[in-house]
Structures are given as C-alpha cells and as structure tokens.
C-alpha cells in the first residue's frame, strides 16, 4: 500500500481535496470526502474478495480515493467529474509509480463509475455497485 500512501500525500491530490471540501461545504446532499472514499474502497475490496478476483488492494483503494476528485473541476468548469477525475488520476498515478496497465484499469473504472455497462464481475461493475452501496440514501435528510 506504499504507492497508495503516495497518492494521499501527493501535493496535487491534497490541493484538489481541500478545494473540493471547500466547494462542497454547503452541499445539501452527502459530500465527496474521505469517509465516502474509504467506504467505496472497503466495499469494493470485500466484493473483490468474495468473487476471488485478482485485483490488488492498492489498486482498489487508489481508484476509490481518486474517483470523485474531478468534482472540483465539475463545479468550477462544468466538466463531467468522471472525465476530469480520469485526467487528474492519470497524472497522480503516474507520479506515484503505477504502471501504464494499472493506470488504464483505474482510469477506465473512474470513467465508468457513474454508468457501467460491463460484465458483472468486472472491476468497473463492482466499483459502480460499491459506490452506490456506500451511500445511505434511504435515510437522507435532504430528501
């Protein structure tokens, strides 16, 4: 998980995360914070283990901690957050030592995390479900 630790310590990641928290401080619905990222990571990891898939833990956690970081650009520039997040993720993942093949898996998953059309056992499909399961929408006070 050494490479994953490099992500959360990466200067661009920290700056983008702080900007995102500021932009969402008055958000009515639940935000995109460390609690959400950690929930998505944990749920994804459990689902991967249950299906006996060979996806390393740091790939899962890295994807979870990067998947909504494009929200800052969405709010400021009107760019879809999955596309903005994929661009940001590519830069950060490269700096943190992930291979081109690993980056492709993670970036593709980030691009598909809102609308997946993958086979059920793919990482993108698992990640999509984990992202949805991470939210307690049924008890949402904003509804």
State the predicted function of each range.
Residues 1-143:
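Metal-dependent phosphohydrolase cores
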